[in-house]
Amino acid sequence: MSYNRFFSIFLFCIGITTLTTSCNDIEDSFTDEYPIKSSITQEGYQIVLATTDLAVGENRFAFIVLSEKGFINRDNSMVTFYAPIKLSHELKEPVQFMYWDDLTRGSFVTNVVFPYPGKWNFKVDLLDKKEDISIQGEFTVNEKTTAPDEGDRAPVAKNKTLDNVVSIQQLSTGDTIDPELYRYSIKEAIESGKPTVITFSSPAFCRDEACGPQVKVLQKLSTRRNSSINFIHVEIYDNPVELQNDFKSGLYSEPFKKWNLPSFQWTFIINCIGEISHRYQGFVSSEELDGALRFYLTERGTKNLCSAI
């Protein structure tokens, strides 16, 4: 089943206009917890928060805005963060709108430093149809992240590659599988002396509005930069062939479990000494990802960390 077809089915199942129901045959504990959705305003607007694994310190904060007609794509937005009530702390940050690669939708992205853990509130202000719109939501900031954080050593989990499967279909649920994304193990990539981009995703099973065609982004960037950077897709399911015929038969892959990922789509950049330099929960566009990768192709990046480029 192709990504587009599955995502269309998914949107039908959840009822994109009401966002209140889900498909029983793809439901599990993750779908109740991710993504975080705000209440729907009287005007019919809602925030879908893609980045829920937040901790004290600097974080990428990304969200989607929905209306009764679908995705809202607007520049010139502002988000205000309100700390737990007893701390009386406020942060105001401009938000950059990043179009997804299909150019029909996008994410609002900013970087923010949270000084305190606890329950935070936020307010998004934007202009839609010449009207000022304000949408409020809430989220939790933890002391530490659940998934590996920037600066952590990348977990060396044994992912499947072309060398240890009988059929390429065992590597991904996607309908188009690019062999270049399955040539190296995580261990081999880390030891190569090059930076590495790893995406954890199941292309045929995007479960929510924050999920997108991430593997296609990887293919696009791999074609452009694969001589200097390793690109790896790790399927989150261990048995993609069986899963195509039975939604309920899915078994999580060992790398997905070892990395302790609290939602279904993640992308990480690993520097040339095996440390995580960037992490992206939910979909990340090729524009945003490539912007981070350019550092490793500069003189500063190669001299400091990347002897093999």
Could you describe each region identified by the protein language model?
Residues 200, 226-245:
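Thiol-based oxidoreductase modules, predominantly thioredoxin-like and allied folds used
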Residues 1-10:
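Bacterial N-terminal signal peptides that target proteins for export
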Residues 236-264, 269-273, 295:
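Thioredoxin-like thiol-disulfide oxidoreductase module
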Residues 26-117, 123-127, 131-172:
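Contiguous segments within soluble domain cores/interaction surfaces
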Residues 145-150, 160-166, 272, 276-309:
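Thiol-/selenol-based redox modules, centered on thioredoxin-like
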Residues 208-225:
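Typically the conserved alpha-helix immediately C-terminal to a functionally engaged Cys/Sec
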Residues 186-207:
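Short active-site neighborhood of thiol/selenol oxidoreductases, capturing the structured segment around
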Residues 19-22:
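C-terminal motif of bacterial Sec signal peptides marking the signal peptidase cleavage site
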